[in-house]
């Protein structure tokens, strides 16, 4: 689920007993409301309906978490540079994800970048969690 809202800003100059409107702007702001594990799991299931192995990988990597309970990005325990539901590593992938216009810190962006990795490299980027999802490898398309 994605919600959108408007933010109106007005800059006002109140010097010398005058009020002058300097500028006014309106921005459309979109925020993802997918915060809970269940909602993330549902989103992963729909997004990777054609690649069920990725649903297993998301569970094994993060237990379907994009965010911690305090709302901060979920980071890996072994490597805190692994972020989000697919534990995309900042060191290896942040620059490329930014070049592609993908924000790996959002649910949608993390899934989109995981799709990119899967389509270009198969399940290899998640080989460290293979003991968890490897029994389901027959679900893999690549």
Regions found by a protein language model. Name each.
Residues 4-35:
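N-terminal, intrinsically disordered, polar/charged segments of Gram-positive cell-envelope systems
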Residues 22, 28-142:
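Catalytic glycan-binding domains that act on GlcNAc-containing polysaccharides
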């Amino acid at each position: 689920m994605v919600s959108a809202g408007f933010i109106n800003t007005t800059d006002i100059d109140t010097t010398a007993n005058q009020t002058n409107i300097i500028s006014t702007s309106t921005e459309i702001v979109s925020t993802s409301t997918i915060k809970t594990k269940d909602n993330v799991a549902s989103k992963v299931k729909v997004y990777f309906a054609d690649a069920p192995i990725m649903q297993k990988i998301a569970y094994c990597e993060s237990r379907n978490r994009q965010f911690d309970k305090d709302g901060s990005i979920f980071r890996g325990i072994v490597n805190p540079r692994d972020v989000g539901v697919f534990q995309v590593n900042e060191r290896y992938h942040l620059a490329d994800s930014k070049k592609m216009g993908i924000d790996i810190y959002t649910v949608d962006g993390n899934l989109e970048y995981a799709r990119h990795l899967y389509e270009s490299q198969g399940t290899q980027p998640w080989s460290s969690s293979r003991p968890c999802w490897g029994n389901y490898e027959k679900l893999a398309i690549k």
